[in-house]
UniProtKB/Swiss-Prot annotation:
InterPro entries: UPF0328 (IPR019081). It comes from Encephalitozoon cuniculi (strain GB-M1) (Microsporidian parasite). It comes from the Eukaryota. Belongs to the UPF0328 family. It holds the Pfam family DUF2463. This is UPF0328 protein ECU07_1870/ECU10_0030.
Length: 260
């Protein structure tokens, strides 16, 4: 009887240990990172951003800063975890992916700084569409998944599972609404913001219960799906940033002649 109950608290303790120091501080950060640039976009006039590039930069910088900070904190926390030799490859792979995600986000910030395009569409893209595209995967990795080798899996239960599924759909919604931005683009911000707020409220009122070993196959599959989504999202973000940086540092010959 005793042996069946020993792993359960161990599992819950190890998962909650994955986030205790910074989760309370960054708990509301995903919501703010999505909502703040959207509010700024709708409150201020387009001329305000045109007259003040610094205001435009501050508006779109916050959502770009949140994911790399989150990934680096996850990497730091996971790096300190003890791991058995049989899990070394998986341990290194998870850490490598977290590092790659952070690098992709940092590249996007650099590309944002050096990009000289000042079109209004760019502001709409960076403040409304993209935050709800690349913030949800980072949010789910930090709140709904255990990254400890040997215990890797999706950990949410109950209503939170449904909320997580809806949050997972947000990147796809953002891509669809790029073409429909004239009428429906506010939903790109509203949907993930509301879902994250609901989830935060539920965590405040009733702390979520974590699953105990053995880990069901569907939980591992759900984690893999979230991880693959993160790879696709940050792969697109990183490749787009690299293209922007390449175009900046290797402008067409005609562009130099025109600018001079």
């Amino acid at each position: 009887m005793n042996t069946t109950h020993v792993p359960e608290p161990h599992r819950t303790e190890q998962h909650t240990e994955n986030q205790p120091h910074w989760k309370k501080i960054l708990g509301i950060a995903p919501f703010v990172s999505i909502a703040f640039p959207a509010v700024m976009y709708f409150i201020l006039t387009k001329d305000s951003f045109k007259d003040s590039p610094f205001l435009k930069f501050i508006t779109v910088l916050l959502p770009y800063l949140h994911p790399p900070v989150l990934h680096l904190l996850l990497l730091h926390t996971n790096w300190r975890k003890t791991h058995k030799s049989k899990h070394t490859i998986l341990y290194c792979l998870v850490n490598l992916l977290l590092l790659a995600f952070a690098v992709a986000n940092i590249l996007s910030i650099v590309a944002l700084i050096v990009d000289k395009q000042k079109r209004t569409d760019d502001l709409l893209l960076h403040s409304i569409i993209l935050p709800s595209f690349f913030i949800p995967p980072a949010y789910l990795l930090s709140t709904s998944c255990c990254l400890v080798p040997g215990q890797i899996g999706f950990t949410d239960t109950g209503i939170n599972v449904i909320i997580d599924i809806l949050i997972l759909i947000c990147p796809a919604i953002s891509l669809v609404l790029v073409d429909e931005k004239s009428k429906y683009y506010p939903y790109s911000t509203a949907i993930p913001s509301i879902l994250i707020l609901v989830r935060l409220f539920r965590e405040k009122c009733s702390p979520p219960k974590q699953s105990s070993p053995p880990i069901p196959t569907w939980r591992v599959a759900a984690f893999v799906f979230i991880l693959v989504l993160a790879v696709l999202v940050y792969g697109l973000l990183g490749s787009g940033s690299i293209i922007t940086l390449y175009d900046h540092f290797h402008p067409p010959k005609g562009a130099d002649a025109t600018s001079s």
